[in-house]
Structure formats: structure tokens, C-alpha cells
């Protein structure tokens, strides 16, 4: 189903190393020609210092089993450069126990003073640590790279020319080592920096667009990610604007998060509005499923789209792990919406709408009732499901109000900030005439 594959688009906004898991995932699918895909991986990995990965890819392409002379020479150069960089950092290598102990690095000023006093630390050592961290990352040694990147974050001033690069590098390395808790902390730190930095409008938009794509990797792997992706993508106007302007395809991941997050059903109304606004620029089976169900009340269309959704999710690296949960919650959405219209439903009709056999549908409904997620009764003799009322809980009402107020507050804050910048710019421009 290459028609709905977003890998090519997503890779444009990811670091080269972050694309490898996506490309390797596609190798296990039958969407693209395997030979061409492996050739692209080889072309990409050749731009890094991961010589072993390069050789492995060559073998998969049935190229030479022996390492070419060019790669032998390049590997020697990589090892030599790595040793040189490690020698440059040698004066602070004695402090490796401090590097690995994050607790002792909380206070930046105290830490720098201790380094200068005990290890004769100089600021040129900081640049050496930055170069080594970057080189280790290029070699695929992400774990060791994170130690030096963290060191740079503690010692480096936020106005340093390399500070933003360190933030991005640290986030990428934590993602690639699957350290999701730390990755979320780095994501938050980077977002705060971007939102407070004095970027031009275009630069800020570009930075947020990249961050949106990287954050999807974190959100769908962190326990709190399903709430956080909704808050960031739907209720932070600056990021929602970036999605609508630069990357409407991200609606797929926002929609998926809302579907599988039963505690955030209040977000559906706002999500549907955005989906309708962007339907002329981006559509896929997941967004169309929600349109069929909540805009057109087309249950047959929703049933068919749900079947397509399964294929789309199965072939999407970001959300493949959510497949079973998505199908279960999507069926529940169909069921709940159908029940709002029909108070009494036959099990056979319901089974047809849910793509299930009648006995499977009955067991499914029984489990919903048993788990206190559904106020209904089953008449087994007549084969009917009789619905009770489904009031919105006070908690859900409160969350809905808070989200609405939060979104309005952020929108007003953004408006005030833009007007302030415009006023300052006009003031600066007026000096040009004197």
C-alpha cells in the first residue's frame, strides 16, 4: 500500500541515523522493490562512519563478501580520527566517573568550577568534547555519545553557537538507544529552547516542523506519550499551525493517538474540526475513518475505512505497535456512535458494522459490560442490545473545559507576542530614515 506510505516524507525531516530504523522496517514489508531499498540504505549509510553497517548492507545486496580496499582505508581513517579526538579530550577523561553520574552535574556552575580546579579544565576542552560526541554519533556509538553530549549541555552556555546542535544530537542519541524517559526530557528541553529563542518566523517554523517529526518517535514509545502528543499537536497553536502549514500528514499520528486514548475522547471534537480544515491537503484511511463516523455518520464507510486503516498501520513504523489497540478502540467508537442513534440494536446488525461474526460481537459486548465500560443489557432470546444513558463524567467535562481554556490562552499569548515583535520591528525600521 505504497499510496499511503509516509516513510519518504517523514525521512526528509529526520536525522540520517533516525531514518535507518524506518528503512529497515520497510525491508520486512513488500511495499517497495527490496533491491532498490537496500541500494538506498547503502547510499545513506555511506555518508556516515558506520563501516560495519556498510559492509553488512553490501552483503545483503550480494556485492563483494570481502571488504573493498576503499572501506579498509576508510575504517583505518575513522579509527585514527577517533583516537585523535579521544586524546584531545584526555585532560577531562579522568573525570569520567563524574560524566556518568548525572546527579553531580545538576549545578552547572559548581560542576565547571570543580573541573577547573581538580582537572585543569579549559573551554577548548569543551569544543573537543563536542567534536568527539558528534564523531561517536556518526560512528553509531550512540550510548557513549550521550555522555559527552550531556557534558556539553551542562558546561555549554545556551548562547553558544553549538548549543542547539547539542540539544538535537542528545535527543537523537537517546531515541536511538531507546531511552524514552530521557528522550522525553530532552524533547521538552529542546521545545522550550525553540519556543523561547529569537528565531525568525521561518526558522522557528522549520525547527518546530523537525521537532514534530522527531517527537512522534518518542510519544508512541513513552507511557505518557499518548496524552502529550495530543497536548502538543492539537492544543499548542504554534505546533498545530506548523502541522497545518508544513506537514499536514502528521494528522495521521494525531488521529491515531486520539483513537487509542480513551481518556481523551473530549479531544475528538477539536480533532474533527482540524481534519475537516485540512481534508483538501491531506487525507488517508485513518482521517477518513473519523470523517465517516463523526461527520457523515456513514457506518458502512467507517467499516470499510477501518479495514484500510489496518493495512496502513501495519506498514507504518511509527504506529505499527498500536494496531490491535487501534482496531479495538475504533470498533468501540463505531459502537458508541451507532448506539447514540439507535437505542435498541440487533447483534447481527452490530456484527456487520464491526466486521465481526455475531457470536464474536456478542462476546465483545459482554466484555464491555463486564468491565463497566458500557451501560447496556443483552436480550439473548431476541438477540438485541438495549442501551442505557451514557452521561459525560464530571472529570471528562473538567478536562474538556481545561483544554479549551488552555488552547485559547496559548492562542492569545501567541497573538500578543507576534504583535509585540511586529511593533519592535517597526520601531527598528523607523531608524533607517534618520
Curated annotation (Swiss-Prot):
PCI domain location: 219-392
SUPFAM superfamilies in alphabetical order: Winged helix' DNA-binding domain
Presence of keyword Cytoplasm: yes
Keywords (A to Z) from UniProt: Cytoplasm, Initiation factor, Protein biosynthesis
Domain of life, per lineage: Eukaryota
Any single GO BP term: formation of cytoplasmic translation initiation complex
UniProt-listed Pfam families: eIF3_N (PF09440), PCI (PF01399)
Record's GO cellular component terms: eukaryotic 43S preinitiation complex; eukaryotic 48S preinitiation complex; eukaryotic translation initiation factor 3 complex, eIF3e
Chain's role: Component of the eukaryotic translation initiation factor 3 (eIF-3) complex, which is involved in protein synthesis of a specialized repertoire of mRNAs and, together with other initiation factors, stimulates binding of mRNA and methionyl-tRNAi to the 40S ribosome. The eIF-3 complex specifically targets and initiates translation of a subset of mRNAs involved in cell proliferation.
Protein name: Eukaryotic translation initiation factor 3 subunit E-2
Species of provenance: Drosophila willistoni
Amino acid at each position: 500500500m505504497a499510496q499511503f506510505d509516509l516513510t519518504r516524507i517523514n525521512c526528509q525531516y529526520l536525522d540520517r541515523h533516525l531514518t535507518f530504523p524506518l528503512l529497515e522496517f520497510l525491508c520486512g514489508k513488500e511495499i517497495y522493490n527490496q533491491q532498490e531499498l537496500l541500494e538506498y540504505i547503502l547510499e545513506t549509510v555511506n555518508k556516515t562512519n558506520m563501516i560495519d553497517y556498510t559492509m553488512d548492507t553490501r552483503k545483503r545486496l550480494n556485492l563483494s563478501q570481502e571488504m573493498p580496499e576503499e572501506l579498509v582505508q576508510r575504517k583505518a581513517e575513522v579509527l585514527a580520527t577517533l583516537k585523535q579526538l579521544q586524546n584531545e579530550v584526555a585532560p577531562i577523561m579522568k573525570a569520567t566517573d563524574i560524566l556518568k553520574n548525572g546527579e553531580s552535574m545538576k549545578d552547572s556552575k559548581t560542576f565547571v568550577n570543580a573541573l577547573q580546579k581538580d582537572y585543569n579544565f579549559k573551554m577548548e576542552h569543551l569544543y573537543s568534547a563536542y567534536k568527539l560526541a558528534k564523531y561517536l554519533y556518526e560512528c553509531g556509538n550512540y550510548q557513549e555519545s550521550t555522555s559527552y553530549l550531556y557534558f556539553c549541555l551542562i558546561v555549554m552556555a545556551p548562547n553558544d553557537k553549538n548549543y542547539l546542535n547539542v540539544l538535537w544530537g542528545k535527543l537523537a542519541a537517546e531515541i536511538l538507544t531507546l531511552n524514552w524517559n530521557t528522550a522525553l526530557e530532552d524533547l521538552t528541553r529542546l521545545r522550550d529552547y525553540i519556543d523561547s529563542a529569537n528565531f525568525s518566523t521561518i526558522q522557528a517554523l522549520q525547527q518546530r516542523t523537525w521537532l514534530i517529526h522527531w517527537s512522534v518517535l518518542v510519544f508512541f514509545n513513552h507511557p505518557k506519550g499518548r496524552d502529550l502528543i495530543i497536548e502538543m499537536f492539537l492544543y499548542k497553536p504554534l505546533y498545530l499551525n506548523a502541522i497545518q502549514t508544513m506537514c499536514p500528514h502528521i494528522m495521521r499520528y494525531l488521529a491515531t493517538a486520539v483513537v487509542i486514548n480513551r481518556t481523551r475522547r473530549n479531544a475528538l471534537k477539536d480533532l474533527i474540526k482540524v481534519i475537516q480544515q485540512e481534508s483538501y491537503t491531506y487525507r488517508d484511511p485513518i482521517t477518513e475513518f473519523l470523517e465517516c463516523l463523526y461527520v457523515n455518520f456513514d457506518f458502512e464507510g467507517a467499516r470499510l475505512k477501518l479495514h484500510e486503516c489496518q493495512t496502513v498501520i501495519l506498514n507504518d513504523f511509527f504506529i505499527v505497535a498500536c494496531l490491535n489497540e487501534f482496531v479495538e478502540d475504533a470498533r468501540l467508537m463505531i459502537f458508541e456512535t451507532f448506539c447514540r442513534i439507535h437505542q435498541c440494536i440487533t447483534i447481527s446488525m452490530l456484527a456487520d458494522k464491526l466486521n465481526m461474526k455475531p457470536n464474536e460481537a456478542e462476546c465483545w459486548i459482554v466484555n464491555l459490560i463486564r468491565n463497566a465500560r458500557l451501560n447496556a443489557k443483552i436480550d439473548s432470546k431476541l438477540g438485541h442490545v438495549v442501551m442505557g444513558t451514557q452521561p459525560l463524567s464530571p472529570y471528562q467535562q473538567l478536562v474538556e473545559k481545561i483544554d479549551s481554556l488552555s488552547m485559547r490562552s496559548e492562542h492569545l499569548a501567541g497573538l500578543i507576542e507576534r504583535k509585540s515583535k511586529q511593533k519592535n520591528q517597526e520601531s527598528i525600521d523607523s531608524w533607517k530614515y534618520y
